[in-house]
């Protein structure tokens, strides 16, 4: 999916919501535990309930890998289900990969060839040769970690050099030598607030994947005020605030209502550019 197609979906649905599929076997409704594949059963119900209101899904690989082979099977089934039934949805493998070149090449093959996923999150710490293998796939996206929403982001990402330049700013500037805004996005946490203003000075046209609204306390209004550009430029993720709002047999309907509420807020924000 290219940048223009992504923007067209945003305009059509009046939404830039990404639903995070951080599916924890210990948190799904009890009645699903009797299913042969409870993780997939939960994901399928969530996807069917929320697809009208979002433009992307983001399975977090850690939740699937923690279950071994069964978890990976559930992940693959989830990806295939979304592609077959909701082909307009942008799929993000939240894997945070990044290693020496030949290892990154294998990661890229996994997500882009074997699974045919639209995008993957990548850690930039090891530099250009750890990222470029992911960029060799036409039509696929790298979503590079820039400024995350966790407390530990202060340990490295916000440290300054002698000239006052912060590490995340170096990442943004250097990585633009590797790919343009048709192939690279950046992760910027919703809790970073005014930092979006600084980020847009460096990458005015790139899409930003923004986790951290909902359960993590980020403000959608603030993200849009400082981060939205003329083509929206935002994919805002909510995981727990949608998929875990209810643990009864009505969980899917509750997730749909939660997604609809966020979409309605996003529709208001989009009036500024549409």
UniProtKB/Swiss-Prot annotation:
A molecular-function term among this protein's GO annotations: orotidine-5'-phosphate decarboxylase activity
Pfam families noted in UniProt: OMPdecase (PF00215)
Annotated pathway: Pyrimidine metabolism; UMP biosynthesis via de novo pathway; UMP from orotate: step 2/2
Catalytic activities: orotidine 5'-phosphate + H(+) = UMP + CO2
SUPFAM superfamilies from the UniProt entry: Ribulose-phoshate binding barrel (SSF51366)
Alphabetical keyword list: Decarboxylase, Lyase, Pyrimidine biosynthesis
Keyword presence, Lyase: yes
InterPro entries: Aldolase_TIM (IPR013785), OMPdecase_type-2 (IPR011995), OMPdeCOase_dom (IPR001754), RibuloseP-bd_barrel (IPR011060)
EC number in record: 4.1.1.23
The keyword Lyase appears for this protein: yes
Residues the record marks as active site: 96
PANTHER family named in the record: OROTIDINE 5'-PHOSPHATE DECARBOXYLASE
Assigned protein family: Belongs to the OMP decarboxylase family. Type 2 subfamily.
Name the record gives this protein: Orotidine 5'-phosphate decarboxylase
Taxonomic source organism: Bacteroides fragilis (strain ATCC 25285 / DSM 2151 / CCUG 4856 / JCM 11019 / LMG 10263 / NCTC 9343 / Onslow / VPI 2553 / EN-2)
